[in-house]
């Protein structure tokens, strides 16, 4: 049986940064869990918006990959991973595509704020490696995700969602369906 030992690779890696990385891992896994819930809500037979389901499933996988990237960083820097319980999503019935997109936008802004705070901590602790990692792998991607979700919310509202079921059907078919061709 081995006990947790101090790392031989740890250098210029503050305990506060290590703890903040563990919190960010939990937040990324929570976001993945929320998106997974959204995906399977839209996959239900009484909702049947398959491209919303695909879109949110893709987002779930992205968030899980973000968590895994942070876990890899934690090990590379000589930190220790301490996983916490993942909070359940705030709701099970996402009501509409518009509501889900609004919730996703709020979630991404929270994730982004947490990353900005992590970057500030890394700056305060004089950790250029962590700053570079966050800038390279997260910040620009977050801004793009927030913009995309904001655009989706705007377009759904312009189309008359959620009052118009046809709006969400057309958005599912023509906007989210077309995104398959861009990937």
Swiss-Prot record:
Record site: Essential for association with cargo receptor NCOA4: 23
Name the reported effect of residue 87 to Q.
Reduces iron binding and oxidation rate. No effect on iron binding but the oxidation rate is severely reduced
Q: Which residues bind Fe cation 1?
A: 28, 63, 66
**Result when mutating residue 23 to A:** Abrogates interaction with NCOA4. Fails to localize to punctate lysosomal structures
Provide the residue positions that the database annotates as binding Fe cation 2. Answer: 63, 108, 142
What function does this protein fulfil? Answer: Stores iron in a soluble, non-toxic, readily available form. Important for iron homeostasis. Has ferroxidase activity. Iron is taken up in the ferrous form and deposited as ferric hydroxides after oxidation. Also plays a role in delivery of iron to cells. Mediates iron uptake in capsule cells of the developing kidney. Delivery to lysosomes is mediated by the cargo receptor NCOA4 for autophagic degradation and release of iron.
Quaternary structure, per UniProt, is: Oligomer of 24 subunits. There are two types of subunits: L (light) chain and H (heavy) chain. The major chain can be light or heavy, depending on the species and tissue type. In the human liver, the heavy chain is predominant. The functional molecule forms a roughly spherical shell with a diameter of 12 nm and contains a central cavity into which the insoluble mineral iron core is deposited. Interacts with NCOA4; NCOA4 promotes targeting of the iron-binding ferritin complex to autolysosomes following starvation or iron depletion.
Q: Which disease is it linked to?
A: Hemochromatosis 5: A disorder of iron metabolism characterized by iron overload. Excess iron is deposited in a variety of organs leading to their failure, and resulting in serious illnesses including cirrhosis, hepatomas, diabetes, cardiomyopathy, arthritis, and hypogonadotropic hypogonadism. Severe effects of the disease usually do not appear until after decades of progressive iron loading. Neurodegeneration with brain iron accumulation 9: An autosomal dominant neurodegenerative disorder associated with iron accumulation, primarily in the basal ganglia. It is characterized by global developmental delay apparent from infancy, and progressive decline of motor and cognitive skills. Clinical features include delayed walking or inability to walk, spasticity with hyperreflexia, ataxia, dystonia, and poor or absent language.
Task: List the protein's name.
Answer: Ferritin heavy chain
Q: Which gene encodes it?
A: FTH1
């Amino acid at each position: 049986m081995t006990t947790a030992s101090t790392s031989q690779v740890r250098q210029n890696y503050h305990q506060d940064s290590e703890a903040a990385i563990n919190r960010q891992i939990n937040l990324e896994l929570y976001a993945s869990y929320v998106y997974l819930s959204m995906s399977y809500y839209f996959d239900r037979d009484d909702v049947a918006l398959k491209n919303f389901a695909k879109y949110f499933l893709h987002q779930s996988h992205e968030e899980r990959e973000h968590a895994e990237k942070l876990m890899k960083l934690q090990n590379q820097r000589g930190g220790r991973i301490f996983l916490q319980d993942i909070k359940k999503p705030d709701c099970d019935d996402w009501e509409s595509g518009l509501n889900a997109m609004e919730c996703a936008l709020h979630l991404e802004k929270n994730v982004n704020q947490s990353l900005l705070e992590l970057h500030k901590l890394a700056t305060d602790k004089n950790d250029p490696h962590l700053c570079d990692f966050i800038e390279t792998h997260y910040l620009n991607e977050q801004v793009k995700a927030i913009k995309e979700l904001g655009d989706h919310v705007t377009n759904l509202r312009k189309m008359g969602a959620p009052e118009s079921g046809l709006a969400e059907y057309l958005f599912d078919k023509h906007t989210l369906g077309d995104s398959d061709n861009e990937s």
